[in-house]
Amino acid sequence: RDNTKKVPGHDAEYKKGLNRTNYSIFLEHTYEDRNITASAGVAAVKNTGNSDGFKFYPGVNASWRFLGNWKLYAAYNSSLRMPTFTELYYSVGGHAADKNLKAEKMQSVEGGLRFSRPWVNAVVTLFYNHGSDMIDWTKDLSEGADAPWRSRNYTKINTFGQEVSARIDFVSMLVRDDFFIRNIELSYSHINQDKKLEENIQSRYALEYLRHKFVVKADFHIWNGLCANASWRWQDRVGNYELFENKVSTCNMVSYKPYSLLDARLSWTSGY
């Protein structure tokens, strides 16, 4: 009891605690020419919650601007994420944490092409992420309806993705402040992972992701200070959920279905 600590504002005491310290050293160098920008760096990281010594995480970024409006870019980065105290010790309310979780490691490669002018901006991006010891909360329904959510490490998860987006500013293109459509934006992204969901296993984070996402946005000038904007998106998520009937679990998993959502807003600006 001598080691307990009062909870501020409550008639309660902390009975367990943990301290950890993070040490980071960064070194980076940047080179800039008229059309070329490049930078390389490394981070040395040590956390007292990890038995390892200092680990080094390099990163490289480069871009090349050509033909005035085009830019080609590429990047490589690596990183570390320590498990949170919740992931390590939260074992109440249907959760069972693992105090022996390892830190997440991530390596990512990204490349893309951008075209930009005052009235248009378009980007194509490709990326690849290699994650090891990725942390997730999972639930195994083969253990029954009362199965707990357990924190765990996944050995490896490889993620591949593509993104395409374009934005057109009609006010700048037509040099007309009163044009009905002020701007329009289109974007599409696709992600695929090589780690598949196991049978009867429900994932809360690592294995649930948006495989497809398509978005259309537009801003409109209606009359004087009256404007509107609208956004429509269609999403297809990978993952599943636990089916309940009459507030009781059926211990069955149901895959998410694609859905779409439309948002719209009117606004008025006085003194237009």
Model-derived segments and their meaning:
Residues 31-38, 126-130, 150-243:
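Gram-negative outer-membrane beta-barrel transporters
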Residues 51, 65, 71, 78-132, ...:
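Outer-membrane beta-barrel signature, preferentially recognizing the C-terminal barrel domain
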Residues 16-49, 55-59, 177-179, 185-188:
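Surface-exposed extracellular loop regions of Gram-negative outer-membrane beta-barrel proteins
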Residues 25-31, 60-64, 111-117, 126, ...:
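Residues on the lipid-exposed face of transmembrane beta-strands in outer-membrane beta-barrel proteins
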Residues 21-27, 42-44, 56-60, 97, ...:
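Hydrophobic, lipid-facing positions within transmembrane beta-strands of outer-membrane proteins
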Residues 8-16, 43-48, 93-99, 108, ...:
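Extracellular loop and loop/strand-boundary signature of outer-membrane beta-barrel proteins
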Residues 1, 26, 37-41, 59, ...:
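Residue-level detector of the transmembrane beta-barrel scaffold of outer-membrane proteins
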Residues 2-4, 33-35, 42-48, 76-82, ...:
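Transmembrane beta-strands of outer-membrane beta-barrel pores
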